[in-house]
Amino acid sequence: FEPNEITTEQILAGILTVLAYDKKNDNLDYYRSIITKVKPDIKKELCEAAILKTKNEDFDLAEEIFLALNGLDPEDVAIKLNLALFLDQRADSYRNSGLNEDADAYDADAFSYYEDVMNAEPPLPDAFFNAGFFFMKQHKYREAKDAFETFLALTCDASDDELGENGVYKKERAQEIISNISNQNIDDESFKAAYDLISSGQEEKGLEEIKNFLVNNSKVWNAWFLLGWGLR
């Protein structure tokens, strides 16, 4: 081993590894100053690399890059949101492969970052829009409705020109989901309790809850699906 054989790229890679995994290192600020001085566009480069790796389903490397980004600039809310979205997507990948325990662990990590970005000041509308879909996936319809309503409240004063085509689509999609939740009454406590009980193996209690819900909500297909799931 010859120290003079170490390249700048290897040193920077080592620093990024520290930033990703050693959050309590006393020298983090020093390491950040080094890497941003040598590579002023490092955040942009890493973001592009992480997104590309995610698209190619190279999840291990993508996760390492996202964690390094978060370590490089812990106060950047956009980075935290991207990390939440990545963890959310990786949880889906694990669940689709039948690895439910791994999926649950990644969902828990994703929720932690979603919660963090939803508490950011000034508020970031996209944090609530994306968190809404995360809650929908978990059948937490009341939380989803709250998130989408907050997104609409944060964007209500923006014109269509300011929002752009994608922003207008998001507003319309958020309103559509809110209406569906309200019309089907699936943010009702009985529906949520039934889902939680059945998914935790307490089918008898869950079936009682969903039958009570169906008395006044007989046209809600989600409820009939939940009933069938409990009877399986």
Model-derived segments and spans:
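Short coil turns that delineate tetratricopeptide repeat
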Residues: 40, 74, 121-122, 156, ...
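TPR-adjacent "capping" and linker segments in tetratricopeptide-repeat scaffold/adaptor proteins
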Residues: 2-5, 29-47, 173-196
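Helix-start (N-cap) detector for alpha-helical repeat units in TPR-like alpha-solenoids
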Residues: 43, 77-78, 125-126, 159, ...
